[in-house]
């Protein structure tokens, strides 16, 4: 939650002024605020949870607070030192040859005289092939082939599921679970009720006590399928509980192998926090080693070689984009914002983990820039700025004119221009992609976002703890999800006409749920540190206020249950087979939610970015794979 510094204020009268000030009122407010230079670091305060506070004194004597965040981990010299040879044409030519060979594998499954045709395993071959290219991160090359394969599988799907082949007498758990997951992810109407057929007479999922490798693989696919659950699907909840317990027990018995590593990865990250490029990197390490899951009629070596080449070719593009991003960061004046967290490389990493198609450079860079700005603003509203300054800044941003920054404190002048220039720049890129000017739309999102910050400012200054409903509605906006997603997705080569955009952005259910996950998950990771800084309002504290006698643990359980429900709702909004909006138009908003969720998986990974987040940067951006 972005809450405002309780440092001494130049004037408290500004707090109740309208944020839609006229130019005359804005100038009047300006006269109450002295122009400030950048602050100098002062005495260290008592540490609070994982992040301590530092008291600073600005040039005009105003006492301020700064979060004692660690500095940018990825300096310019390091980024410039990265080297790669995978941008050479020979690697791209080699990849193109392999793409052609993999297409032949797909096509031979569909030809009547193809050597891969087998009525006893033609269904599982197709599903396995689609699942493999997706997990290896190379599916973008085979969209037509994937559709053809899944159309074929779906034509044999029944209320009993599927067997290995079209002539299989009975359905089996492995084929049905993997088929359910894969078909559902592509928008086919498949019911989870098929899983009830794999329960015993007591209504429980049943497996043999021996836990063979084949059975473990089937239960692993059951677990993966259970994560693509929709609201109200009790059988999916039961499948998740059963399969998770089964796999955890299996890990205690089986030897260390590619299968055991795959189980650990899937149990660790699930689906909603298993980012596609991260999964590709992990799956490259285990693919082809597991003889139980490999298909002798499919050349896994060629699939693996292509996956490695594609990973490293994109790595060479990442290097160029990172060099550009670091130059932008320096040229924009961002390093002068010493009060904030600088996580532009980390945000770029998240973007490249969910959108690694070469043509989506604008999305990756736009997302990194926008999230960097949001984070600096969060720290400005949260700790460094006074209420008067922040109200002045918010009103000036609504005027959207560089002259409005003239009366701002010096540090805010720089911040104003970073926002102004970057939003305009991304809008220009969006206009090229969408064929229309989207600036007014973007400004509306930014205005509402900053208004939500000011609402939180009033709560903390007046000591008001809102109801859960008040906090939740405002908090979904102040989470920043909508602001972070809107402009970057409009730079993509995906049409977003107004009737589609309203189903993806505000006021859509998709947008609402994505914002909710970020707000709720962020609160569960940050509320203790926020409270130690005097920032009381969170979903946990507001829920406890509404329900006297509820313990903190009870409140956390309630919020975590809400998150699970919201995730299922978000799954439905993305994959609803009756939706008039294609999955391709919704997927990147959904994946942005996954990226933010990953950042809060273990802790506040945006404040403490030198542990899991650093590992993600190294594994998916810095280090290539070995061919």
From Swiss-Prot:
Xref: SUPFAM superfamilies: Terpenoid cyclases/Protein prenyltransferases (SSF48239), Terpenoid synthases (SSF48576)
Give the top-rank taxon of the lineage listed in the UniProt record for this protein: Eukaryota
Keyword Transit peptide tagged: yes
Pfam families linked to this entry: Terpene_synth, Terpene_synth_C
Q: Where are the transmembrane segments?
A: none
Per its record, the protein catalyses: (2E)-geranyl diphosphate = (1S,5S)-beta-pinene + diphosphate; (2E)-geranyl diphosphate = (1S,5S)-alpha-pinene + diphosphate
UniProt cross-references to InterPro entries, sorted A to Z: Isoprenoid_synthase_dom_sf (IPR008949), Terpene_cyclase-like_1_C (IPR034741), Terpene_cyclase_plant_C1 (IPR044814), Terpene_synth_N (IPR001906), Terpene_synth_N_sf (IPR036965), Terpene_synthase-like (IPR050148), Terpene_synthase_metal-bd (IPR005630), Terpenoid_cyclase/PrenylTrfase (IPR008930)
Range annotated as the organelle transit peptide: 1-36
Which family, according to the similarity comment? Belongs to the terpene synthase family. Tpsd subfamily.
Protein name as catalogued: (-)-alpha-pinene synthase 2, chloroplastic
Q: What lineage is this protein's organism placed in?
A: Eukaryota, Viridiplantae, Streptophyta, Embryophyta, Tracheophyta
